[in-house]
Curated annotation (Swiss-Prot):
This is NADH dehydrogenase [ubiquinone] 1 alpha subcomplex subunit 5. InterPro entries: NDUFA5 (IPR006806). It comes from Macaca fascicularis (Crab-eating macaque). It is a peripheral membrane protein. The gene is NDUFA5. Accessory subunit of the mitochondrial membrane respiratory chain NADH dehydrogenase (Complex I), that is believed not to be involved in catalysis. Complex I functions in the transfer of electrons from NADH to the respiratory chain. The immediate electron acceptor for the enzyme is believed to be ubiquinone. The modification N6-acetyllysine is found at residues 30, 46, 60, 98.
Length: 116
């Protein structure tokens, strides 16, 4: 890529990324590294890993920024980068929260019954 393709994203507070492919590759790889620490049978890992691998393959296969934006369907690449940063943050939290483990205590019998 020969320099920045655009001067602004047109979105307040969202700066243009000069190396979006590199940034996305790094973020998606970090997400996959965190997911590897979560049990394979956890639903969050299974589905997030599948989506992240698909997106990483698109980033590696498509050098054209505009075509990649169209394939990822997440807006401008700067927006996709922001989404990937949020997913990485969530993956780290999920790893720490361990939602796949059993509850500490049993929930009340009518917890989800409505109306009571």
């Amino acid at each position: 890529m020969a320099g920045v393709l655009k001067k602004t994203t047109g979105l307040v507070g969202l700066a243009v990324c000069s190396t979006p492919h590199e940034r996305l590759s790094i973020l998606y790889t970090k997400i996959l590294d965190v997911l590897a620490e979560i049990p394979k049978n956890a639903a969050y890992r299974k589905y997030t890993e599948q989506i992240t691998n698909e997106k990483l393959a698109m980033v590696k296969a498509e050098p054209d920024v505009k075509k990649l934006e169209d394939q990822l369907q997440g807006g401008q690449l700067e927006e996709v980068i922001l989404q990937a940063e949020h997913e990485l943050s969530l993956a780290r939290k999920m790893r720490d929260w361990k939602p796949w483990e059993p509850l500490v205590e049993e929930p009340p019998a009518d917890q989800w019954k409505w109306p009571i």
